[in-house]
Amino acid sequence: MPSYYVNKNIQPTGEHEVHKEGCHRMPELQNRVYLGYFSNAIDAVREARRYYTNVD
């Protein structure tokens, strides 16, 4: 299962983006929150909503 992260910075469209380990758009280490291992992005987004309300 891959690791997922959420960007601490808000995107111009207003949400915090979730990224899978290895993503070419992965935020810098200081700009991301580790979410954990998930078998799919939907579960990772659910976890990210514990930190931020507007997540994609």
Residue ranges of each PLM-predicted region?
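Aromatic side chains
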Residues: Y4-Y5, H19, F38, Y52
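Short aromatic-glycine-(Arg/Gly/Cys) micro-motifs in beta-strand/loop hairpins
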Residues: Y5-R32
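A short, exposed loop/beta-hairpin motif centered on an aromatic-Gly-Thr core
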Residues: E28-N40, D56
